[in-house]
């Protein structure tokens, strides 16, 4: 049994507590939050659990094995560092840290103390992303050409980060997981309209072998859109995460150049075949992720979404921010 302390009971924290509480080999012993209303909600939902306003109390508790940090990114480093120094495994909400130096320090600290870090990249545990990764690995899609994502909605405006640091970690972690290569350069453009932070942004990532990824993130959209297009040499797919049933659609469509003899003799064959929808398991990704974290702790394994994976995403976020500040200058990663 792994005993958890959860720090942060705002928007995402209740989901973390609920899913940990549902696992047979995990138990939430303590919840901390600085907000009186959040603590009241936690006490009402879990009257037998210790509720406190002091995160340090949770971190220092000798009966707690692991800490879940579900707080704003600017708090992640200090909380995670204290937890690791006190022998606690750490599950931390995305993005991992505010900068790469902090991420590297936490990774080294965890390694010295033989502790596990897991960064909450929840989408990697969805049935859709698992299926897409399988389709790439087994060659169904062929050589990958592009990843093109739109992740937009009205709000929720953040007071401490821009839209890139709020929404892009989802796609950047997915891209990192699927492509399995570091981007060579990142170009980002965006604009600030309301609260001093960029609320609209467009990020382009250039990878080796001609692979390109594009991510559109936006807090000022009248509609919520969660759509990703992935194109390969053999097949293409559309992933609409807002679809209840047919989240992933695979299209047997493609283009083949059959002749390059002169500019006006280009022969292009367009292939248009069937569309099919793979069956996806209906599971809550966060529960799968937390169960995997518990297994990694008990079995001494390193999770694939560990601190190093979190560092790669933070490195991409930093590059995107630098490009934003220079109005789209290409930044090496």
Predicted regions and their residues:
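N-terminal Rossmann-like dinucleotide-binding module
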Residues: 1-46
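A contiguous active-site-proximal alpha/beta segment in oxidoreductase catalytic domains
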Residues: 74, 97-159
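C-terminal helix-rich "cap/oligomerization" subdomain common to oxidoreductases
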Residues: 66-71, 288, 292-333
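Rossmann-like dinucleotide-binding domain that binds NAD(P)(H)
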Residues: 154-223, 229, 243, 308
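Beta-loop-alpha module in the N-terminal Rossmann-like domain of NAD(P)-dependent dehydrogenases
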Residues: 16, 49-109
